[in-house]
Design a protein with these regions (language model features):
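Acidic/histidine-rich catalytic neighborhood of metal-dependent amide-processing enzymes
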Residues: 41-116
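Short, solvent-exposed beta-strand/turn "edge" segments of beta-rich domains on protein surfaces
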Residues: 142-143, 233-241
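Acidic/His- and Gly-rich active-site-bordering loop/insert found
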Residues: 1-38, 57-63, 247
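A short beta-alpha structural unit
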Residues: 250-251, 279-290
Length: 290
């Protein structure tokens, strides 16, 4: 009999900001027919679904194959131990099919088979100016403000057409054929429902591509977090000494996450003004797969 290996993960993204939760994140509740709690969607819920499906097929004598489960606890931080584990446990993990229990559906009523996932390059940048915070009344307009500089640098990474501006970023991207694009856009995706579910007025992204193409087969760049200066209640008129951001780039076949990290660092340093110092760090990455 064939063997299926089911991969999933039980670790989750951080729960902050806590004040936006209506229930405790790690105390799941059923509301409106749905389970609410951290990991209900990514990825405890999906893994549980496959485990229960396996259990039901065993109970009814309908299991047509062997099944193995591999659930890890480091997916959200780049699966740092997974590569070593897979190399050391090749015999244990040997299978004919790998089922990734960590994907999505086009809609609530449309079963979907995901046959590819974009890759990732995840970076952190820090822009530093003066050695300490300065008073904006005394130094504003004369000293580079790291927060202002960072905002300009980050904004320049994607142009008005939604394209990443890093030189060489698209060099290895495999372009889809007209037939592949037609096949992709035959999927029962409803843009109006998509916008409604996200509570947005309109979509955005790379010009010339549909939302399905933008999220599935085109690379992208996003700021995941940005911080610096005074953000508490009240006022504090400073020029912050430093400002930082976390930036992720989603990659498509033929793009190498290590190469993209080097291109990003080289470009970010090149566009930074001499009035500030820049630190660029690669956090983690993963290869795209189709």
């Amino acid at each position: 009999a064939k063997t299926v290996l089911v991969y999933g993960h039980y670790d989750v993204m951080p729960v902050d900001p806590l004040d936006e939760w209506t229930t405790e994140p790690f105390e799941p509740v059923v509301r409106d027919g749905r389970i609410w709690g951290r990991g209900a969607d990514d990825d405890k819920g999906q893994s549980f679904m496959h485990i229960k499906a396996f259990e039901a097929m065993c109970a009814t004598g309908q299991l047509p194959c062997n099944v193995k489960f591999m659930l890890e606890g480091e997916e959200e931080i780049g699966s740092q131990s997974l590569y070593k584990f897979c190399r050391e446990q090749k015999r244990l993990l040997k299978s004919d099919v790998i089922l990734v229990s960590d994907t999505s559906m086009i809609s609530m009523d449309t079963p979907s088979i995901t046959c590819g996932l974009r890759g990732l390059t995840y970076m952190q940048v820090e822009v530093t100016g003066p050695e300490k915070d300065l008073h904006s009344g005394l130094f504003g307009g004369a000293v580079a403000n790291p927060a202002n500089v960072l905002a300009r640098l980050v904004a320049s990474l994607v142009d008005d057409e939604g394209r990443v501006t890093i030189p060489g970023f698209y060099d290895d991207v495999r372009e889809l054929s007209a037939a592949e694009r037609r096949a992709l856009n035959k999927a029962p995706f409803r843009l109006a429902d998509y916008k409604r579910s996200l509570h947005i007025g309109d979509v955005a992204g790379e010009a010339g591509y549909t939302t399905m193409e933008r999220t599935g087969v085109r690379p992208s760049l996003d700021v995941n977090g940005i911080w610096g200066g005074y953000i508490e209640e009240g006022t504090k008129t400073i020029i912050p000494a430093r400002a930082s951001a976390k930036i992720s780039m989603r990659l498509v076949p033929n793009q190498d996450f290590r190469k993209i990290a080097k291109l990003f660092e080289r470009y970010f340093r090149a566009i930074a003004p001499r009035s500030v110092k820049v630190d660029v760090r690669f956090l983690h990455g993963g290869a795209p797969y189709v």
